[in-house]
């Protein structure tokens, strides 16, 4: 009987660990928490190619808010690449805010609504606390007379930081 109780307790207490490896994460997160609790993000981060930028952008005074859904395939694809890119240009982790959103694109502090999130992921860039640009869903640029054109994350990042 004692063995049965011990086995039950071990399985019961271990279940949340195994079931949460790809769970919906909501609220403020660190990169380590994201990777530990969601294997898709971690695997995509490991497989992301290192970036070779032709020019180093000026990141003095730059901070980034990343609002995303762990359930969202665009977030699973773009956020690991973005995190690797931000690391490659020397962005310190304390300048990057990761905010997990639920299926309604919101979270307990209502930041989905505050930041007017319509698509995930939404990446908001600030220079000295003033918003200077956004990437919504996938990297793209607006070309006059053409409309939105898909570009790489590097091109979109450089455009925002250099404008």
Where on the chain are the PLM-derived regions?
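Non-catalytic, surface beta->alpha helical segment in thiol-disulfide oxidoreductase systems
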Residues: 125-163
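Conserved helix-turn-beta segment immediately C-terminal to the redox Cys motif
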Residues: 58-63, 81-99
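Stable alpha-helical elements in mature extracytoplasmic
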Residues: 78-81, 153
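Thioredoxin-like thiol-disulfide oxidoreductase module
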Residues: 99-120, 125, 138
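Conserved redox-active cysteine motifs that mediate thiol-disulfide chemistry
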Residues: 69-78
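N-terminal leader/targeting and pre-domain segments
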Residues: 20-59
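Sec-dependent N-terminal signal peptides
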Residues: 4-15
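Thiol-based oxidoreductase modules, predominantly thioredoxin-like and allied folds used
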Residues: 67-70, 93-107
């Amino acid at each position: 009987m004692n063995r049965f109780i011990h086995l039950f307790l071990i399985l019961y207490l271990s279940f949340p660990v195994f079931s949460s490896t790809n769970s919906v994460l909501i609220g403020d997160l660190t990169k380590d928490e994201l990777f530990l609790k969601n294997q898709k993000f971690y695997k995509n981060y490991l497989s992301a190619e290192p970036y070779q930028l032709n020019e180093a952008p000026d990141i003095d005074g730059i901070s980034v808010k990343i609002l995303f859904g762990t359930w969202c395939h665009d977030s699973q694809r773009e956020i690991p690449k973005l995190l690797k890119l931000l690391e490659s240009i020397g962005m310190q982790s304390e300048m990057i805010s990761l905010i997990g959103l639920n299926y309604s694109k919101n979270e307990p502090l209502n930041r989905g609504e505050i930041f007017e999130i319509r698509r995930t992921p939404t990446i908001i860039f600030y220079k000295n606390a003033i918003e200077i640009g956004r990437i919504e869903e996938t990297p793209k640029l607006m070309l006059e007379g053409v409309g939105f054109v898909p570009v790489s994350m590097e091109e979109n990042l450089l455009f925002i930081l250099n404008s």
